């Protein structure tokens, strides 16, 4: 079945462009977070940027080449504070998983492109998790809970690996002397 000239082709192009732009926005947002002293949030923006690159690649690989013309709207945002950037990122992820990709999946299904429909649905699941993470990080920033928790916790220095136990991080790491911005909650995920 030929993809060329279908609505699915246009949707794949729009999704490819959207994911590519999100990737770039997230790298810009990472720089802003780093400047504000949020090393972990910067790393999460970069990790998510890499995820978006892979989503874009998945959509791109379905395309059959040549030129295609379509009309689409994209966010003409700006680089704000970390809180503003987290909010904008969460809104973009929400738009993808709740509206765009389900609609694109339905059209692909109708047109007989079952593998494309499945890709849109699977990627939507990832975008849900991206939104959740951004909203939780936004809540932490807004409530001053990035480097301080209500209960004692184990923190790790992202630079040297030092573990600190307590409700908040020290002003600087006693091992490597990096500022508190390098601490994050330690998660044993291995």
Which residues make up each language-model segment?
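Non-heme di-metal
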Residues: 1-190
């Amino acid at each position: 079945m030929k993809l060329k000239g279908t609505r699915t082709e246009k949707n794949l192009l729009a999704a490819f462009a959207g994911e590519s732009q999100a990737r770039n926005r997230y790298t810009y947002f990472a720089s802003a977070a780093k400047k504000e002293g949020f090393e972990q949030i910067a790393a999460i923006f970069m990790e998510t940027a890499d995820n978006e690159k892979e989503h874009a690649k998945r959509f791109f690989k379905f395309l059959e080449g040549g030129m295609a013309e379509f009309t689409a709207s994209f966010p003409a945002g700006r680089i704000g504070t970390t809180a503003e950037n987290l909010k904008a990122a969460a809104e973009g992820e929400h738009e993808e998983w709740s509206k765009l990709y389900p609609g694109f999946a339905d059209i692909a299904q109708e047109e007989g492109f079952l593998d494309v429909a499945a890709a849109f649905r699977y990627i939507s699941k990832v975008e849900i998790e991206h939104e959740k993470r951004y909203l939780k990080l936004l809540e932490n920033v807004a409530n001053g809970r990035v480097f301080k928790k209500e209960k004692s916790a184990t923190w790790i220095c992202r630079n040297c690996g030092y573990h600190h136990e307590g409700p908040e991080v020290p002003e600087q790491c006693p091992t490597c002397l990096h500022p508190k911005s390098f601490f994050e909650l330690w998660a044993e995920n291995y």
